[in-house]
Every structure is written in C-alpha cells, then in structure tokens.
Amino acid sequence: MADPARRDPRGRAPELPGDLSSQEEEEEESDSDAGASSLGSCSSASSDTDLEPEWLDSVQRNGELFYLELSEDEEESLLPETQTVNHVNHVRFSEKEVIIEEDDSRERKKYEPKLRRFTKILKSKSLLPKRHHKKKSSNTGPVSILKHQSTQRTGVTVQQRYKDVTVYINPKKLTAIKAREQAKLLEVLVGVIHQTKWSWKRSGKQADGERLVVHGLVPGGSAMKSGQVLVGDVLVAVNDVDVTSENIERVLSCIPGPMQVKLTFENAYAVKKETAQPKKKKAQSSTNDLVKLLCGSEADATQHSTLSIPHITMYLTLQLQSEVAREEQEMLYHYPVSEASQKLKSVRGIFLTLCDMLESVTGTQVTSSSLHVNGKQIHVAYLKESDKLLLIGLPAEEVPLPQLRNMTEDVAQTLKFMYGSLDSAFCQVENTPRLDHFFSLFFERALRPGKLHLSASPSAQQYDAASAVLLDNLPGVRWLLLPQELKVELDTALSDLEAADFQELSEDYYDMRRLYTILGSSLFYKGYMVCSHLPKDDVVEIAAYCRQYCLLPLAAQQRIGQLIIWREVFPQHHLQPATDSDPEAFQEPEGRYFLLIVGLRHYMLCVLLEAGGCASKATGNPGPDCIYVDQARATLHQLEGVESRIEEQLAATPGPCLSCADWFLAAPREKADSLTTSPILGRLQGPSKTAASPTCRRTFFSDYSFKARKPSPSRIGGGREPGEGEENVGLSPHTTPDTVRKQRESEGSDDNVALLKLARKKSTLPNPFHLGTSKKELSEKELEVYNMMKLTSGPENTLFHYVALETVQGIFITPTHEEVAQLGGSVHSQLIKNFHRCCLTIRAVFQQTLKVEKKKALSDGDHLESANSVSSLSPVKEHGVLFECSPENWTDQKKTPPVMSYWVVGRLFLNPKPQELYVCFHDSVSEIAIEMAFRLFFGLTL
C-alpha cells in the first residue's frame, strides 16, 4: 500500500518491491498530485488519525467521481476463471537447497489492495517503503477485475481478489523458543494461526497440502501489525512462491535473516468453498459485460462487435469559421470510427443541405430522413439548435423511426443536464473521451438491448427487451405501488436526510455555512422508483441520466457493494430564466447544482444538491464531501429492514390483475361469429365488416367522442354465461370457458397446466381471470378486493397489459417483472412485443396532437383563454389497433389453428392534467378506456 500523495500519472499506487531488507531512511519528495488529495473534501478528516474514504483516490481532476464496488458474490462471479489459479512460481526442495522454478507459461500478475483506509496508520508505523521503483508501462500495477488491459480508466475503481502485504520477519525469534517444543514457523515468524482440518489429519492428505486460511492472528505479530491481514484471508504465496500447508514451513525456514517479505493473500470475501459448483455461467458472462460496459473498459470490444452495422452520431455546424475550405471543418464530433459509419459520414453534406433547404422552403425543421447503406435502410434523426445540428443514424430493422426520434431527444436532454448545453458538450476537446463512452453505451442499448437486460427468468428478460422500445423513452420513471405504511417509512427516511439538521450537516456544528443545500432526493429499488421528493422536471432528467448510463438495470440485476457517483449537473428547470415579471415571484438563486448517487445492494439513492443561495458558494471543481456521502449511505443502511417488505410487494403484484392471452384462444368458427358483434366495433360509426384474413389483421379507427357512445352491450365473445356446462366439465377456480374450449380443441398443453398450477399458489386473490362457481364461495371482503384489483368489468378479467403515464409527476405504472413472468405462453410473449411497438406508434400520434394544440394555444393573443378553450373542446384523444393472432408452430394439419383478437388502445387526457393510458385487452371486453383510466389513476400519489 502506498501513500496517495505518491502516485503515477494514472492515479495508481506503485507496486511494492519484493525485497526491502535494506531500507533507506531518506524521505523522498512528495509529489502532491492535485488530483485526489484536493478534490474530495472531507471535513471530518482533519486530524492525522482519521482514515481516508476508499473512494477518495478515484476522484478526477474535474471533481467527478464514479466509484463502483460490487457485493462479494457479484465480484466473485465476475472474476475470470484464469485468475482463480495462483499463477506464481513453484518451489521444489532438494536435500541442501531450494530450487525455485518460474512458470513461463503464464505471467504472474501483481495484485495490490484497492482500499487505502490504513494509509496514515501504516505510514506512522514506518511500514510503508520509502522508495518506490516505478515499473515499465507493460506492468500496470493493480489489475482491476473489470479491466484486462494495460490502460486503466481514470475514476473507476473496484475491489481486488488478491492483495500483497509486506511484513518484517526476523528468524532470530526462534532462539527464544528453542527450549520449548518446536512451534510452527507460520505463527512465530508471520503471526498467522492456521488450524489444519480434522479431515485432513485423519485421511493423511499430504500430496498438495491444503489452503492456508487465516484462522487467527498472534497478538503483536507481524501480520497484526500490518493491519491488512484479516481472519478468513488465504495465504497463497511468499515472495511469489506459492505455498500450502505442505511446504509453508520449509519455505519460511529458508529465510536467511531479518528482512521484509512480501506475502500474497486472497481476500476473505473472495474465498469460496471448493465444492461450490459454477452456476449461471452465461448470466455471469453477460453481467460481466454489463459492468465492463458501464465502467468504459469494453468500448473497443463493443465497437468491434458492431463494425458491420451502420450507425453514427455527428454534431455538425452550419456556419463555417473561415473562408478557406478545410476538410471536415463542419464536423465538430462523430462516433464511432468504422467502415460502416464512414459511409454515413461521407454523405453528411446531404443532411446539411436537407436541414437548411427544407427549413427555408417549408418553414419547418426537418426531423428525420431515411437512406439505404449496404442494402440496409438507415433512419437518421435531426435535432437543430441555433447553427448546430445533431444527427443520429441507426438501422431501421433495429430501431423504429418514432423510437429514434425519442432517443435523440433524450440524448440532447441528458447532455444538457450533464454539460449545460450541446455546445459545451461537443465543442470542448477534453469531453471527447467522455462522449465516446456515453455514445458507446447509447449504441449498445440500441443495437444489443438484450445484453443489458439480464434477468433470472427468460420471460423477464424478453419482457425487458420488448418493453425498452416504449418505456426507455417515456418522460418518467417506473413507479412501484407500495402500501401506505411502507411509503411513510421511506418518506420519513428521505425527509431526515433532506432536513440536514443533525451532527456535521448542521450549521451549528462547525459554526459556518453548510456546503450544500439538499433540494430533494429519489429512492430506487431494482430499477423502480419507490419514493421521491423531487419535482417532476428533476425526476425526469435524473432518470434519463440513470438510463443512459445503465444504472437502473445494474441495480436491478446485481447486489451493489457500494456505488458513488458525483458530478456537477445543470438542471434546466432551475437554470432557465424566469418568465414571470412579478418581483414578488420566486426567483431561483444563482448557484451550482451537483448530483450525488449512492448505491447499496439493490437500492439507489439520487440526491440533488445546491451550492449557493442558502449554502456556501462553490469554487473550482469541488469533489464529493465525505459527510454527505456517509449520510446518504447511512440512509440506505437504515432501510435494510424494509427491503424484504418491498420484495414481498413486488411478488404480490400490486397493480391490476392480468390474464394470459393463451387462455383466450377460441375456435375459428366461434371467432368468426363474434367478430361482427365486437363491443368495441359496435360503438364505432360504420365499422368495417369485411371478413377476417387468416393472418394478423389490424383495424385502425379514428378519434371518437365519449359522449356519443351507446350503452355498453353485454359480453358476447365468451359464447356462454358463467357457470354454463359446469355439470359436465369440472371447472377449477383457475379455468374459464375460453380455456375449456381451447383445451377441448387442442387437447391442452403442458405450459397451460404449469401456468394454472402457478396461479393456484397465489392465495391472496382467488384468480384474476375468472371466478366461476368459486365466486359464490368468496367472502364479501375478498370479493371487494378482487373487484378493486380487476381493471375491467364483467365476470372475466380480460386485461392483458397496460402502461399508465402520469406526466405531471413524471412516473409511469406498468406490470412488474414478476407479474409478466407468471403469464407464460408463446402468444402472450408476442402480444407483449406487439403492444409496446403499437403504443410507440400511437404515442407518436399523440405527440403530434400535443404540438398542434400548443401551436393553437400560442397563436391566440390571450394565452389562458385559448388553452382553456382548446382543452374544453378536445378533452381526450383516443387511438387503437385491433390484432388477430394464432399460435406459432401449429402442428395439427387437420384442424385450423385457433384465433384470438385483442385491442391495443391508447388514450390521451389533456384536462385536468396531461395523462396517457395504454391498455391491451381481449376483443370481447365492453370497457372503455376512460373508465379503466379512472380506476388506475384514482388515488395515485407520490
């Protein structure tokens, strides 16, 4: 371990030399690198006895910090198999000498501890070397488990599996115990107590020996004095010679005299039982890739894997700086550098011409264009600000055009949040590496979404990949409904943190103005927001930042040991100039804003702080303050007992009950009769009554008024009343008439049987699909709970999926992964994919509607009157699509595959506040979207 003040240019501590027997007492000049020592402010670390936080050395020169430390189990799974073998020198003994054989096949990697908590203690005890021999560039010092290359990324630190500890060993101690029985050299010289297993003694295993696990430390011994050896560590090498219980005594006996000896230990958390079997290797590999990508160590590999896919982002200027033509002078930034992107880069003049010419001719800005490259259609989205143009191009088969437009707007929003403006982001050369990392993550999410969505079950993984088309670009964050008593506990914990009126956070503690004012915080659990005390604009910007940097899937998939992110941000809501001329209106103070993100296990706490105003003004590039980090981490530790209750809520499906689409497969002749009597089509004026084609059919219908609708007819699509035929067919509490028909036609399936068995395990509600005769057996309270949980009316639950967006609060509600995982089936999985892609198209229509409404409101002189009149004339907008589907891989050639029809309906509410609802339900439903929206949004509060 080395003093943080003496570091190489990359911020790493030099390695300890192997032999320090001839220590020199001269003090070297301390290079006080302005990086770590001055960037992180630790108010409590004023005395020499205080310990530095482990993340302090990771603070960058601009004050930013990204520190990731996975939990013990996650880090162990991320270690490559090649590192589990001790690549050290081997030793064999002859009668008179020790022969050390170097392992030429594999080079020994030096491991060095990452945590530097005991730096000052070791220095005060003169246990640190006074002279460091710098290695060549090929020897990179400590090797991160996330990086297998020579160049380390500044600001990213993770725990190591191995650590080197230098201790002073004096063989003369043996003379003091000469009269006694022969003692173990490991205890006398090193101060480590190791107890051989009873099974080894009994069986007489002496071939290779057992691992030297530290079971205890001798008081006053060299190991205890070092302060780095812990109980549970495993001694694997002495001066790069691998040791076991069989040869440790002979290796130590070869030490000629008093000297410094390097001991290599395997950290206690990395010790794993020998009988443990490797599990989920594929998942671990994907998780490893996710963490590598997040830390920026896989940018080259990511670019290499997508070289053949045309994709690009460019930031161009429409105003040339000089009259002399210069190659690529209009290009301020582009990524990536590949042959496929080079073709898009070479035609950038077309994009500039379209942007300039169409705007001058039509008076409107161009939003997108399409072209073919290597036989593939490429969509290009435009975003123009003043005389600059941001272009993002992606293949049409990977990213639909509406999604690309939303992604481009999200990129611009996030970059403004991080750098203040697009010019500040792209026009500063020092930001180029950060932008490369940003867009490597962006294109990875766009081109390979499955790599970032790693879940325990394949159905949940498919759900993540399918829903990302819509959910990743909504102006909000996924919200988890919680019971009131649990919500109160979370609110109380965040309120205590935000009050900042205790101990070091209080102004009276140091008799000085506090460094920052906590404006608010948001708490996430497994990617769901469970509590928030931030306004909507801040929530949307912080959630977009977390999505772009894959923080939400990271917390959902892995147990984080510690995550600390600190950076200056520019929230547009606080920095935009005030439009109100009233002098008494609230004015935002002229301050600076910082984002602190602290992660622990599956929790992630985002805190927005303000410097200036009531707090002290920030100067330079301040790093994270230890006190605020510790208090945020203490808040997460305080919520340890709540974690199990949140897990129960996730498993209890807090939202409306859902049904599986595979349960509704009907015979084709029965389906043909019900098409002409569809409740939804019956309410439309002049619906199309053409015969349905065998393939998937979609019927678009325009907006219609709620007041003009006729009373909803009774359910027709079921074909029979509840309870009919119950004497001949034994209906279980979890079957329906549609299910019985399906089983009679297709002889049943193992998937449905397994699904019905899974549904029986949910004892909180009888069955969200159909009650049948069991409805009579329910108590009045159980029936009331069931009706509250069922979003649709009627005897059967016909709701397949839903997404409710609350734009005022910046949240959306959708079924949890656990709910979707319980509804298996090939038809239902295809339904989920169609639903999100269809909703993406419907929402694009809604966005155009909002733009038109906004222009109408602004064109009138009286803004308020116009807005109110528009809202009263068009309170809602609705759009929907009718799908027909059949099971895939239908093998029975004699029978026609069953057909199921379902609606995907979106509804836009403008009054009293903007809301969007997207639902997917069976064609037989007699519900209307406004009724379902009222049930879903009623009582929804943060």
From Swiss-Prot:
Extent of Acidic residues compositional bias: 22-32
Listed GO MF terms: phosphatidylinositol binding
Record-linked Pfam families: Intu_longin_1 (PF19031), Intu_longin_2 (PF19032), Intu_longin_3 (PF19033)
Family matches, as SUPFAM superfamilies: PDZ domain-like
Any one of the GO BP annotations: embryonic digit morphogenesis
Gene3D superfamilies: 2.30.42.10
Domain PDZ: 189-267
Basic and acidic residues bias locations: 1-13
One GO CC term on file: cilium
Principal subcellular localization: cytoplasm
Region (Disordered): 1-54, 129-150, 707-752
Oligomeric form and interacting partners: Component of the CPLANE (ciliogenesis and planar polarity effectors) complex, composed of INTU, FUZ and WDPCP. Interacts with CPLANE1. Interacts with NPHP4 and DAAM1; INTU is mediating the interaction between NPHP4 and DAAM1.
Homology family: Belongs to the inturned family.
Described function: Plays a key role in ciliogenesis and embryonic development. Regulator of cilia formation by controlling the organization of the apical actin cytoskeleton and the positioning of the basal bodies at the apical cell surface, which in turn is essential for the normal orientation of elongating ciliary microtubules. Plays a key role in definition of cell polarity via its role in ciliogenesis but not via conversion extension. Has an indirect effect on hedgehog signaling.
Record protein name field: Protein inturned
Species assigned in the record: Rattus norvegicus (Rat)
Gene: Intu
